[in-house]
Curated annotation (Swiss-Prot):
Naturally occurring in which organism (per UniProt): Escherichia coli O6:K15:H31 (strain 536 / UPEC)
Record EC number: 1.2.1.8
Alphabetical list of InterPro entries matching this protein: Ald_DH/histidinol_DH, Ald_DH_C, Ald_DH_CS_CYS, Ald_DH_CS_GLU, Ald_DH_N, Aldehyde_DH_dom, BADH
Protein name (Swiss-Prot/TrEMBL): Betaine aldehyde dehydrogenase
Reactions catalysed, as given in the entry: betaine aldehyde + NAD(+) + H2O = glycine betaine + NADH + 2 H(+)
Domain of life: Bacteria
Organism lineage: Bacteria, Pseudomonadati, Pseudomonadota, Gammaproteobacteria, Enterobacterales
Length: 490
């Protein structure tokens, strides 16, 4: 693909040049080619985006629930019509295989938007009787202008996960995509405008997180920030949001999630689940189950089943429909993952497979890392304690149920957890003791629109998806009505 035209900001229903004069490049990680130069939003751009959003939000919130619902449903239709085009752009920008982006990224994002479009008429208040002559009623009102700050691993899906409930509740959103993968969020803005969203209700500001993102979190005109990213960045976002104007926050942060295989599990099923929990999207999924706990007596058999499945991974041209494994999102991220792999070797973990870059035709110019499995791991190893966010699995052995629950919970993270077992009683008994916000039994990774997702501990605050997220983008107003004559004590 030839280099794209310089990408601008999207404010008030159209493209506009950044006033900052700063730009950055977005790179195709499969081959190192520059896809586009992208303009970066500065403080003045944030100010005008907020002013635009405030204007648009008043128009949007004044529409009826059904009017808003119809506009968002039109956006869903356009997303599905343009699925293949958007998936190709997502593949170029992220490096993910087209077989994945064309069936998951846009599809699941559109599903979330359709879900919230259908929920809009359900936003309602309540009536509370006090006495014969007085009652209280409540209203759910939008927050106003909110900000979304996205991560680089699921660019358009995250933009939809954040914008769908925000817009459904009557808010306007200013969205800052990751500077690593900024392109499809701009296309989403086009689609919202085409569907009939009032100008200003969805503005997109590409830029560097430490600048554009910080301006958004500090701006007094923004009522809430929804952030997806790493724990360290999330803490800064939360601190800035609170210090500036006590903004509400939703934080979807990192994870180091446990996958527990019990001794009664079907090891074929367990190996399939472990592969999906570690190598889907080349391991760049926040919920990945990278700490795989296996009974000591099952370790050798389990390792052989994992090795057999790694042999079946197809890393190749990302647009080949048979390819199911792509490069990492960027060269700096590849280098970071390689540092973790080197640390694992240094600390005594045994490399079962992988452990280096992929080499040869089609790989040498890209950010490719081989699917890597470490075994003979211990809980104190760096690769077991820290989030790597790459195709790196760590296998650990255990002896008892109580032991594995304790060790699974021995982490600052609490995003996800899963177990594989044939015992239904054990499944629920154990899952109820795991300190994680998203849990799976005999499966892994699905996050449907109806399912609230979010973490415990350092893995986040608040939830995305589900009914409760729609409500989190509203504020409750209570109104007392008195029908009898008011009695003053003065």
């Amino acid at each position: 693909m030839s280099r794209m035209a310089e990408q601008q900001l999207y404010i008030h229903g159209g493209y506009t040049s950044a006033t900052s004069g700063h730009t950055f490049e977005t790179i195709n990680p499969a081959n190192g080619n520059v896809l586009a130069t992208v303009q970066a939003a500065g403080r003045e751009d944030v100010d005008r985006a907020v002013k635009s959003a405030q204007q648009g939000q008043k128009i949007w919130a004044a529409m009826t629930a059904m009017e808003r619902s119809r506009i968002l449903r039109r956006a869903v239709d356009i997303l599905r019509e343009r699925n293949d085009e958007l998936a190709k752009l997502e593949t170029l920008d992220t490096g993910k295989a087209y077989s994945e982006t064309s069936t998951v990224d846009i599809v699941t994002g559109a599903d979330v938007l359709e879900y919230y479009a259908g929920l809009i008429p359900s936003l309602e208040g309540s009536q509370i009787p006090l006495r014969e002559t007085s009652f209280v009623y409540t209203r759910r009102e939008p927050l106003g202008v909110v900000a979304g700050i996205g991560a680089w691993n699921y660019p358009i899906q995250i933009a939809l996960w954040k914008s769908a409930p925000a817009l459904a509740a009557g808010n306007a959103m200013i969205f800052k995509p990751s500077e690593v993968t900024p392109l499809t969020a701009l296309k989403l803005a086009e689609i919202y405008s085409e569907a009939g969203l009032p100008d200003g209700v969805f503005n997109v500001l590409p830029g560097v997180g430490a600048e554009t993102g910080q301006y958004l979190t500090e701006h007094p005109g923004i009522a809430k920030v929804s952030f997806t990213g790493g724990v360290a960045s999330g803490k800064k976002v939360m601190a800035n949001s609170a210090a500036s104007s006590l903004k509400e926050v939703t934080m979807e942060l990192g994870g180091k999630s446990p996958l527990i295989v019990f001794d009664d599990a079907d090891l074929e099923l367990a190996a399939d689940i472990a592969m999906m929990a570690n190598f889907f999207s080349s391991g760049q999924v926040c919920t990945n189950g990278t700490r795989v706990f296996v009974p000591a007596k099952c370790k050798a058999a389990f390792e052989q089943k994992i090795l057999a499945r790694v042999e079946r991974i197809r890393a190749d041209d990302v647009f080949d429909p048979q390819t199911n494994f792509g490069p990492l999102v960027s060269f700096p991220h590849r280098d970071n993952v390689l540092r973790y792999i080197a640390k694992g070797k240094e600390e005594g973990a045994r490399v079962l497979c992988g452990g280096d870059v992929l080499k040869g035709d089609g790989f040498d110019n890209g950010a490719w890392v081989a699917p890597t499995v470490f075994t003979d791991c211990s809980d104190d190893m760096t690769i077991v304690r820290e989030e790597i966010f790459g195709p790196v699995m760590s296998i650990l052995i255990y002896e008892s149920e109580d032991e594995v629950i304790r060790r699974a919970n021995d982490t600052d993270y609490g995003l996800a957890a899963g177990i594989v077992t044939a015992d239904l009683n054990r499944a629920h008994r154990v899952i109820h003791q795991l300190e994680a916000g998203i849990c799976w039994i005999n499966t892994w990774g699905e996050s449907p629109a109806e399912m609230p997702v979010g973490g415990y501990k350092h893995s986040g605050i608040g939830r995305e998806n589900g009914v409760m997220t729609l409500q989190s983008y509203t504020q409750v107003k209570s109104i007392q009505v008195e029908m009898a004559k008011f009695q003053s004590i003065f």
